[in-house]
From Swiss-Prot:
Alphabetical UniProt keywords: Cytoplasm, Deafness, Disease variant, DNA-binding, Isopeptide bond, Metal-binding, Nucleus, Oncogene, Phosphoprotein, Repeat, Transcription, Transcription regulation, Ubl conjugation, Zinc, Zinc-finger
One protein family per Pfam: zf-C2H2
Compartments, as annotated in UniProt: Cytoplasm; Nucleus
Classification via PANTHER family: SAL-LIKE PROTEIN (PTHR23233), SAL-LIKE PROTEIN 4 (PTHR23233:SF19)
Cross-link (Glycyl lysine isopeptide (Lys-Gly) (interchain with G-Cter in SUMO2)): 156, 175, 190, 290, 316, 372, 374, 436, 550, 597, 623, 838, 896, 932, 947
Family in the record: Belongs to the sal C2H2-type zinc-finger protein family.
Residues modified as Phosphoserine: S57, S307, S776, S789, S852, S1019
Species: Homo sapiens
InterPro entries tied to this protein: Sal_C2H2-zinc-finger, Znf_C2H2_sf, Znf_C2H2_type
Name used for this protein in its record: Sal-like protein 4
């Protein structure tokens, strides 16, 4: 085996070689039989003309003999020369930097003067010329080759050719090229040196006159290769960064490629360092390393990557390495090559040629060996550059790119929803069976592009809406005046298309003609050049102007885009569309453009208005109508019927039938005036079916009256002829909008004295008024009540058609009215949460005139909250709406306005009351959403006997406090009990918490039961003649029964 000699070997002269001076033309040099030693240890070590241990002994003797004959040895570097002229020329340029001499073990000392071997110089000034075939060579020997020997080559000196640049091999670089030792990537091994058969003809080397020019070209090539290696390393790092989040579809392959890339990076770093240290060395392994690092995609031909000065040099292919013409069409330098296209492979990268690692960058169903370069280019042509997914067609890639851009170009013409594909839009259109599908609505996305830069219509950017245009309508607009944005922006796209800051001025495209609804996207104009998809994929790059490239440009411009067009300029919240943004702005401005023409309530959206209009719709043919037994007036609500009967009994309503048109109002009845000037009267049939707490508290009340609510002592007047006008809207705090109707007393306010309406105010009601006023200061701001008058008995318009809603309406009005001492409203039920109210009521009369002057300001209406002020004044919490704030305030005040009419429990919200109703479970089959409960047990107690009423309730409650005609009292109770017994299923329990009262005279009340009066038979109208007579005690001072009772004093099962 070979061994490395000392660092500075000395040439030893042999006795038998002295005196012989005839030059020998050829002495095959020795080389390492184990090629890894010179390749790894010293890249510049000569590995020319290797000899092997397998050569026969006679060949070795011949080699020794040739080396001893006429060899001139340099004393400084021990270089050996065959010619005296070369030896003399060498002496002039020789330095004391000796090469490493590698010899075979069987070789003996070589004489210093006779040896004519090859030149082993490493000097950059004399490579490639010391071991060349000389023209002046004398004798020659025939090329001899043993049949079974492959490593020894004998050259004929007479066949030496003059050096021609066209015959110089790319592997020469100043070294002997006619050798059977080559650097080649071997499969399954990391050995970089391979021995070829001696059949290949040796290549001639350049002459001495071309050495400086060759050295200059080599230096240029080294610089180019260093730059290419650095560029390749940068590309590898960037691809690794992409692979961290892009190659999710092939996780195992991505990890393997990363590991291989890191290994290659280390080897490249070592090679670059070696190139810097051995700049003058021109070894074969170094040359192969340089050539392997040339990006294949940048090699249009076999010599295109070389310096222009090296153009005369041609690449000499051998039997196993052929330069294919398709190298310029390879998709990427990162892709593994087929075996037939292994070109300039590095000895360090032979691991990449393993079969198990060939197909890591391709889909699993495609073999790396079977795919031709042209097929690879077609395969990776439709590859997503963001997630590395490969698609079969360009249209599939476009659809996929929309998942990155977020754009949805297909818009439903009915509802405005957007979709990424036409098929999804067609499927969605089936949801609109009332609209006939128009084939033109499903225009192909590829054909609908904007003029100028070819951006699709749906990729255009919508403008943010102009705030003054918020009040126009609720429909989304496609084009509005832009606010602070270029005029070439358009509307009608997904807000998720563009986010981020504003575009530079040089990326703004010019205005383009109208096409499909708007101009084009900023920053994607024809003058804006974006990186193409698959930056290293050669022909895989989309063609300029294609839809795929535009979509990729859109993804790249997302971070550079303008401010989101659907972002609120006030709170910077991003909405889903322009219409949502417009409705969102109304939360800041307090605007409610949609007003109910019946009750005057305003809403921010048309949908809420439509929902509200269902409250006013009545269908008397379906709903049960209850007729008054006295005047035969029909009611759809039993609560209003009972109030109507109470007014009959109190003399507030004449006992004669009312006019046919109950909507004929007196002059004192205010009309509902809308913002658009339309007026509407409140008819008793247009009663409110359902008033939700959220709707009541969040409503906007349009202003049609300038009257200011007056303090409590000044609004009480007992004129029975005054009209009573009631509005159902209880305006909520915190909303900006015109006030609805200030329902105030139309009678005498100037006298200052208050006549009792029949309900005695005492200290407890005053304190309740005070407490409630402190809890809810904004409750009284728009609602004041008027006295009932026979001329206008439309008080039932405040009540609900259904007992459940009426119960809530009364709970929110009657409790407030009675706690504020407003006795003018005849209330059937007294809403007092029994959980915290326990009042002992004296029988003495306390009028409102006895109120302390210091308490009067507490009862005055508080100023309205301004818009956007939904903050709790006690704890500082903020809420999104006035309804939420109102519910929250009940946690501070302890107010529980929703009371169960069965067990008496009170709740803060209607929803909690609904849930509580389900716990009783009795008679829920006939309940309307759990709130309309029949009271058969109560009817069983009442029966048909008039005396049963007095037996059920205490006498001190039932005994009239004024002189009442016994005939009227007996007839009324008989009628009531009989009617209830007949129509049991139509009686519903609405309220509890107090005992409902039945007035028998003006203001005098008595408790009948916890039920409301349902439909009364016309047969009971016979008592109308007796009831028509007004009571003789109308002028007598009135007394009242207690407002509140203890929680457990009376319970209705």
């Amino acid at each position: 085996m070979s061994r490395r000699k000392q660092a500075k070997p000395q040439h030893i002269n042999s006795e038998e070689d002295q005196g012989e001076q005839q030059p020998q033309q050829q002495t095959p040099e020795f080389a390492d039989a184990a090629p890894a030693a010179p390749a790894a240890g010293e890249l510049g070590a000569p590995v020319n003309h290797p000899g092997n241990d397998e050569v026969a002994s006679e060949d070795e003797a011949t080699v020794k003999r040739l080396r001893r004959e006429e060899t001139h040895v340099c004393e400084k570097c021990c270089a050996e020369f065959f010619s005296i002229s070369e030896f003399l020329e060498h002496k002039k340029n020789c330095t004391k930097n000796p090469p490493v001499l590698i010899m075979n073990d069987s070789e003996g000392p070589v004489p210093s003067e006779d040896f004519s071997g090859a030149v082993l110089s490493h000097q950059p000034t004399s490579p490639g010329s010391k071991d060349c075939h000389r023209e002046n060579g004398g004798s020659s020997e025939d090329m001899k080759e043993k049949p079974d020997a492959e490593s020894v080559v004998y050259l004929k000196t007479e066949t030496a050719l003059p050096p021609t640049p066209q015959d110089i091999s790319y592997l020469a670089k100043g070294k002997v090229a006619n050798t059977n030792v080559t650097l080649q990537a071997l499969r399954g091994t990391k050995v970089a040196v391979n021995q070829r058969s001696a059949d290949a003809l040796p290549a001639p080397v350049p002459g001495a006159n071309s050495i400086p020019w060759v050295l200059e070209q080599i230096l240029c090539l080294q610089q180019q290769q260093l730059q290419q290696i650095q560029l390749t390393e940068q590309i590898r790092i960037q691809v690794n960064m992409w692979a961290s989040h892009a190659l999710h579809s092939s996780g195992a392959g991505a990890d393997t490629l990363k590991t291989l890339g890191s290994h290659m990076s280390q080897q490249v770093s070592a090679a670059v360092a070696l190139l810097s240290q051995k700049a003058g060395s021109q070894g074969l392994s170094l040359d192969a390393l340089k050539q392997a690092k040339l990006p294949h995609a940048n090699i249009p031909s076999a010599t295109s990557s070389l310096s222009p000065g090296l153009a005369p040099f041609t690449l000499k292919p051998d039997g196993t390495r052929v330069l294919p013409n398709v190298m310029s069409r390879l998709p990427s330098a990162l892709l593994p090559q087929a075996p037939g296209s292994v070109l300039f492979q590095s000895p360090f990268s032979t691991v990449a040629l393993d079969t198990s690692k060939k197909g890591k960058g391709k889909p699993p169903n495609i073999s790396a060996v079977d795919v031709k370069p042209k097929d690879e280019a077609a395969l990776y042509k439709h590859k997503c550059k963001y997630c590395s997914k490969v698609f079969g067609t360009d249209s599939s890639l476009q659809i996929h790119l929309r998942s990155h851009t977020g754009e949805r170009p297909f818009v439903c013409s009915v509802c405005g929803h957007r979709f990424t594909t036409k098929g999804n839009l067609k499927v969605h259109f089936h949801r609109h069976p009332q609209v006939k599908a128009n084939p033109q609505l499903f225009a192909e996305f590829q054909d609908k592009v904007a003029a100028g830069n070819g951006i699709p219509y749906a990729l255009s950017v919508p403008d943010p809406i102009d705030e003054p245009s918020l009040s126009l309508d609720s429909k989304p607009v496609l084009v509005t005046t832009s606010v602070g944005l270029p005029q070439n922006l358009s509307s009608g796209t997904n807000p998720k298309d563009l986010t981020g800051g504003s575009l530079p001025g040089d990326l703004q495209p010019g205005p383009s003609p109208e096409s499909e609804g708007g101009p084009t996207l900023p920053g994607v104009g024809p003058n804006y050049n974006s990186p193409r998809a698959g930056g290293f994929q050669g022909s895989g790059t989309p063609e300029p102007g294609s839809e795929t490239l535009k979509l990729q440009q859109l993804v790249e411009n997302i971070d550079k885009a303008t401010t989101d067009p659907n972002e609120c300029l006030i709170c910077h919240r991003v909405l889903s569309c322009q219409s949502s943004l417009k409705m969102h702005y109304r939360t800041h401005t307090g605007e409610r453009p949609f007003q109910c023409k019946i009750c005057g309530r305003a809403f921010s959206t048309k949908g809420n208005l439509k929902t509200h209009l269902g409250v006013h719709r009545t269908n008397t043919s379906i709903k049960t109508q209850h007729s008054c037994p006295i005047c035969q007036k029909k009611f759809t609500n039993a609560v209003m019927l009972q109030q109507h009967i109470r007014m009959h009994m109190g003399g507030q309503i004449p006992n004669t039938p009312l006019p046919e048109n109950p909507c004929d109002f007196t002059g004192s009845e205010p009309m509902t005036v809308g913002e658009n000037g339309s007026t509407g009267a409140i008819c008793h049939d247009d009663v409110i079916e359902s008033i939700d707490v959220e709707e009541v508290s969040s409503q906007e009340a349009p202003s049609s009256s300038s009257k200011v609510p007056t303090p409590l002592p000044s609004i009480h007047s007992a004129s029975p002829t005054l009209g009573f006008a009631m509005m159902a809207s209880l305006d909520a705090p915190g909303k900006v909008g015109p006030a609805p109707f200030n329902l105030q007393r139309q009678g005498s306010r100037e006298n200052g004295s208050v006549e009792s309406d029949g309900l005695t105010n005492d200290s407890s009601s005053l304190m309740g008024d005070q407490e409630y006023q402190s809890r809810s200061p904004d409750i009284l701001e728009t609602t004041s009540f008027q006295a009932l008058s026979p001329a206008n008995s439309q008080a039932e318009s405040i009540k609900s058609k259904s007992p459940d809603a009426g119960s809530k309406a009364e709970s929110s009005e009657n409790s407030r009215t009675e706690m504020e001492g407003r006795s003018s409203l005849p209330s059937t039920f007294i809403r007092a949460p029994p959980t915290y109210v326990k009042v002992e009521v004296p029988g003495t009369f306390v009028g409102p005139s006895t109120l302390s002057p210091g308490m009067t300001p507490l009862l005055a209406a508080q100023p309205r909250r301004q818009a956007k002020q939904h903050g709790c004044t006690r704890c500082g919490k903020n809420f999104s709406s006035a309804s939420a704030l109102q519910i929250h305030e009940r946690t501070h005040t302890g107010e529980k306005p929703f009371v169960c009419n069965i067990c008496g429990r009170a709740f803060t919200t209607k929803g909690n009351l609904k849930v509580h109703y389900m716990t009783h479970g009795a008679n829920n089959n006939s309940a309307r959403r759990g709130r309309k409960l029949a009271i058969e047990n109560t009817m069983a107690l009442l029966g048909t006997d008039g005396k049963r009423v007095s037996e059920i309730f205490p006498k001190e409650i039932l005994a009239p406090s004024v002189n009442v005609d016994p005939v009227v009292w007996n007839q009324y109770t008989s009628m009531l009990n009989g009617g209830l017994a007949v129509k049991t299923n139509e009686i519903s329990v609405i309220q509890s918490g107090g005992v409902p009262t039945l007035p028998v005279s003006l203001g005098a009340t008595s408790v009948v039961n916890n039920a409301t009066v349902s439909k009364m038979d016309g047969s009971q109208s016979g008592i109308s003649a007796d009831v028509e007579k007004p009571s003789a005690t109308d002028g007598v001072p009135k007394h009242q029964f207690p407002h509140f009772l203890e929680e457990n004093k009376i319970a209705v099962s």
